[in-house]
Structure formats: C-alpha cells, structure tokens
C-alpha cells in the first residue's frame, strides 16, 4: 500500500482537553482513550474500539507485518499465494469452511471477507459483520485465530490454487503493470523493492515444492509480527477478555528471524528510465526525488502533526497553481502536478509529473519544471496561504460536525498505520483543538521553504 501524497485527514488525533494556551511542538500526542490496546505475552498486539456507525455491525482484522519483500528467490510470489491458502483450510475450518460458516449469516466473500498482500504487509478482514449473534462473533475471532497460526496448507489444496493464481498472474499483465515492471528497477534501483512485485514469478508459482511455502509460512506468520484490530457495536471489555483467552494460547516462535527493514540506496547521479508499451497511448513523465521518512520516535509529537499540515498546504497551493494553468486557453499539457507524499515504508518522495499532448513531451516537461522552479525560487504568496488555511478550517468544522459518523474501517486504518508504521492515533477533539491552534502559527516562509528542501540533486529518478 504506497501512498504518493500525504493528505491531512480529519479522522486522526486525540485528547479531551480544551484549547491550548500555547502550542508546545515537542509535547507528546496522547493516544485516543476510546481505543483499548494491549500486547499479549506471545507478542500479538490488539486494538479494540466501540463504534455504532453502523449500529449492530463490527469489523475484524488481522494485520501482519510481513509481505512479499521477505521472500527469497525460490519463494517469489508465495506471500500472496499464502493469502489465498488462508481461505483453503485451517485447523477449525477445513476446506472452504471459513466462507461457508460466514455466508449463512449473510457475510459473503469479496464484499465482507477479503485480504490483500503488499510488499511489507498482509491483511485479512471480516467486515460489516452482524453483532446480534454472540456465536457469530466467536466464529470471527476463531477465524482470526486460525489465520494467525493454523493454516493447514494441504498438498491438494496448494496444487488447486496454482491454477487460480496463474490466471490472476495473467490478468494482472495490464499496460500499466507492464510499464511499472520497466520502471521499478530504476525507481527502486539496487533494493529488494525492484524485484518483488507481489504476484511473483510464474515459474515459481507453478513449480514450488510444498515445503517451500510451509517454510515461508512458519518463518513469517508468527505472533510477534501480528496485530488484531476489532471495531464495532460490541462490549469492549467482554471482547478484550475473549481476545486474551483465545489468542494467548497461540505459541510464539522460538528464535524468530529478525524482521529486516529494506533500504533503498542513496545516489548522487540521476537515474533514468524510458518505459514503453504498444497499448499505452499517452506519454507521461515523472521525476521522483527520494526523501527520508520521519523516524518513529518523532511521530508522536505535535511537531510531526504541524509538519504534515505544512506539507498539505504546499501540495494544495502547488495544485492550485496547476489548476490555474489548466484553466487558461491551450494549456501546455494534458495534466500535471508536483507534491510531497509517502513512498514506501521509511521513505517519502517529492514527485513532479506530467502527461504530455501528442509529440509535445518537451513542451509539457518545460512547463511543469518552470512552475516548479518558480515555487523553488520565489515561494508562495501570503494570499495563497490564507486561502488554504481558510479551506482547511472550513473542512475542519464540517468534519467536526460529522465526527460521530466515522465508520469502522476508518478507525481500523488508523490502527493499521499505528502498528505497521507507528503513526499516532489521536482523538478528534484533540485534533480539532490542535489544528485551530497550529494553523495561525504557520507562515508562508515555512511552506515555501519546503520547495528547497525537496528539490535536491540527490536520489533523483526520472521515468518517461
């Protein structure tokens, strides 16, 4: 799940105090008191929250800090293969037992039951489950329990799934995917991101030995890399007791393999890639500058919160500049933009991009680079900043009125980001007061300075 642009969302942040007399940017962010969290002796982290939007429903997630990057060459594609196998038999739900057990309660595969595998994580979910049946809630907990540690991985089920994933491998070969496959060796040069695309190697998928997938499973599907997140209309104290009783029984792996962090090497020269595909009709150009992510130790401070607001202001004002260009007669490109955002775990990026008119790649590139350079040299104007400040405050007031209508999945997204990337989880009342205090302190010089920080000659990649 990479994100290219950081947008300030209005469902983040917490504390039940009144307005601050003064903003202390080094103050720690208090965790949302509405979330019950803990860590079991075997290492499993759990997050629980009562929520009645929608009433009488709950969502159950298991979040695993393990994905395709952890594969060796013989396992290329097996993190995703394992995701499929989680629906093909577990200790308490043989065969298609998970799906048949839930579908009789109206909880269907695809709509309510799903999963995804990414380079750094694998996530399973049972969403929008009715809470009027205690036995159904217990069934959902038992499914998460089995997904944690008790996949059966039977030979015949593995062989049956090879064909399913082979077909998925073929359908994923879209023009955009083929372009990405050409770009990744440059975008992620000399890193494991360049060689792990999640769907994997077709030869591996068709021919891997049964023990190969079991080895990957036993090495990385383990309690110290897992979190349980459950949000919905239920008694939290009762749910916590059930989680403790059921999940504490899962054994921790002895002498676990350290979970590595995958770096992307720094470089001084610009890397360049020309990616082509006969089915792609438009020419797009990107210049990506890799930037370090914020250390986890700095994310739990108001200063991190303020930084994200400044970054959001920059992106909004840059976007407004591009919108003005597009509204003029005969704009120099089909579309374009530049801005800051997340890249992959541990990294951010500044991205300049444009889609050119036919045979006008030079015109499009010159136009987008000229506007980017104008911001780098001269910054933004006070009036531009005031507009985005006003827009954010208007949006904040609107979001505050709707804060009690936040859905289960939105809360779980925050829990997932906290577990995987140590993003803070704060209550909206705190967020509301903090934003109103921080926004007036942000100057146009602070926002404009970002352009010089992000437009560097190091760690640049250009794709066309």
Give short role names for the model-derived ranges.
Residues 464:
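Conserved small/polar residues in nucleotide/adenosyl-binding loops
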Residues 285-287, 291-295, 300-382:
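Structured mid-domain segments that build the active-site/substrate or prosthetic-cofactor binding neighborhood
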Residues 6-17:
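Bacterial N-terminal signal peptides
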Residues 23, 190, 227-283, 396-399:
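An aromatic/glycine/proline-enriched structural segment found at the starts
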Residues 256-321, 353, 409-423:
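His/Glu-based metal-binding/catalytic segments typifying zinc-dependent metallopeptidases
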Residues 88-90, 115, 119-120, 140-143, ...:
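Scaffold signal of the M16-like zinc-metallopeptidase fold and its non-catalytic homologs
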Residues 28-61:
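Mature N-terminal segment immediately following signal peptide/propeptide cleavage
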Residues 54-56, 64-178, 197, 207, ...:
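Active-site-adjacent, His/Asp/Glu-enriched structural segments that form or flank metal-binding
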């Amino acid at each position: 799940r990479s994100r290219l642009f950081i947008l300030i969302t209005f469902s983040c942040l917490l504390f039940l105090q009144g307005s601050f007399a003064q903003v202390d940017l080094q103050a720690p962010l208090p965790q949302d008191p509405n979330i019950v969290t803990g860590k079991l002796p075997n290492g499993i982290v759990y997050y629980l929250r009562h929520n009645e939007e929608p009433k009488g429903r709950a969502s159950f997630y298991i979040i695993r800090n393990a994905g395709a990057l952890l594969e060796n060459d013989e396992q290329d594609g097996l993190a995703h293969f394992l995701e499929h196998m989680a629906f093909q038999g577990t200790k308490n739900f043989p065969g298609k037992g998970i799906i048949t057990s839930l579908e009789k309660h109206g909880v269907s595969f695809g709509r309510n039951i799903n999963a995804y595998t990414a380079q750094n994580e694998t996530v399973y979910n049972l969403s929008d489950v009715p809470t009027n049946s205690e036995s159904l809630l217990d069934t959902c907990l038992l499914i998460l329990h089995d997904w944690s540690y008790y996949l059966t991985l039977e030979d015949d089920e593995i062989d049956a799934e090879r064909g399913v994933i082979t077909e998925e491998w073929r359908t994923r070969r879209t023009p955009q995917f083929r372009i990405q496959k050409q770009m990744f060796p440059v975008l992620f040069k000399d890193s494991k991101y360049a060689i792990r695309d999640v769907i994997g190697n077709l030869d591996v998928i068709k021919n891997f030995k049964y023990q190969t997938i079991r080895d990957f499973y036993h090495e990385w599907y383990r309690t110290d890399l897992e979190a349980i997140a459950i949000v919905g209309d239920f008694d939290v104290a009762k749910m916590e007791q059930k989680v403790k009783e059921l999940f504490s029984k899962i054994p921790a792996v002895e002498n676990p393999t350290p979970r590595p962090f995958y770096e992307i090497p720094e470089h001084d020269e610009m890397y360049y890639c020309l990616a082509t595909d006969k089915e792609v009709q438009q020419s797009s150009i990107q210049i990506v500058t890799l930037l370090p992510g914020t250390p986890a130790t700095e994310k739990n401070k108001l200063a991190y919160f303020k930084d994200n607001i400044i970054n959001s202001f920059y992106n909004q004002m840059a976007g407004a500049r591009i919108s003005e260009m597009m509204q003029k007669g005969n704009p120099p490109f089909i579309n374009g933009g530049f801005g800051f955002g997340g890249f992959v775990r541990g990294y951010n990026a500044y991205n300049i991009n444009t889609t050119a008119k036919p045979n006008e790649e030079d015109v499009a590139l010159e136009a987008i680079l000229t506007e980017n350079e104008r911001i780098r040299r001269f910054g933004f104007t006070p009036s531009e900043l005031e507009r985005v400040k006003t827009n954010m405050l208007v949006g904040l007031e609107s979001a505050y009125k709707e804060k009690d209508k936040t859905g289960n999945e939105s809360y779980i997204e925050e829990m997932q980001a906290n577990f995987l990337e140590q993003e803070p989880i704060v209550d909206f009342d705190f967020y509301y007061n903090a934003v109103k205090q921080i926004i007036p302190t942000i100057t146009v010089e602070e926002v404009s300075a970002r352009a010089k920080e992000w437009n560097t000659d190091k760690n640049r990649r250009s794709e066309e």
